[in-house]
């Protein structure tokens, strides 16, 4: 079990960002962190430990994005000991992430990372690609990294 501080530092190193931005309203608060990644561009890290209703941690960003022209990559880190890493709630969270990507094209990317899983390395690589795409100039940039 890694602490939130260690997990935040580790993800910052993996993604090439520093999670030191002040929370924006209630975003990036106790369950996560924010990093500035450019002009009106942010990387958010949400660490999911309980996994009771993970979709709530995702949905909190939607109104924030709707009210502005901000761009965001959300890295949703699911702890190894989180309950129900698979199942209907996990599937709903992934579906809502995909829906937000469609409704907010070029402005939002959802990157789920299941810590300690066989797919973790590929998931981190996809998140890193999304962060790099976020840093590119707005014209000619795909937030989804060619996906």
Give the residues covered by each predicted segment:
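Acidic-basic catalytic patches of nuclease active cores, encompassing PD-(D/E)XK
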Residues: 1-25, 146-147
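Phosphate/oxyanion-binding active-site loops and adjacent basic polyanion-contact surfaces
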Residues: 3-4, 53-57, 123
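Alpha-helix C-cap/termination motif
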Residues: 14, 37-38, 67-71, 102-106
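Catalytic centers of nucleases
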Residues: 23-37
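Conserved catalytic cores of phosphodiester-cleaving nucleases, focusing on short active-site segments
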Residues: 32-34, 40-51, 64
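Hydrophobic/aromatic beta-strand patches that form the interior of the parallel beta-sheet core
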Residues: 43-45, 73-75, 111
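Catalytic cores of nucleic-acid endonucleases
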Residues: 50-99
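Domain-level recognition of nuclease-like catalytic cores that cleave nucleotide substrates
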Residues: 81-146
């Amino acid at each position: 079990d890694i602490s939130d501080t260690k997990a935040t530092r580790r993800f910052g190193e993996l993604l090439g960002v520093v999670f030191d931005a002040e929370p924006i309203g209630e975003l990036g608060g106790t369950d996560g962190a924010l990093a500035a990644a450019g002009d009106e561009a942010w990387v958010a890290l949400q660490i999911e430990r309980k996994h009771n209703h993970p979709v709530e941690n995702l949905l909190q960003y939607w109104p924030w994005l709707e009210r502005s022209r901000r761009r965001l990559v959300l890295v949703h880190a699911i702890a190894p000991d989180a309950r129900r890493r698979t199942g209907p709630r996990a599937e709903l969270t992934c579906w809502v992430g995909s829906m937000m990507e469609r409704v907010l094209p070029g402005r939002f990317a959802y990157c789920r990372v299941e810590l300690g899983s066989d797919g973790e390395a590929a998931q981190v690589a996809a998140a890193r690609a999304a962060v790099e795409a976020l840093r590119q100039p707005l014209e000619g940039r795909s937030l989804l990294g060619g996906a």
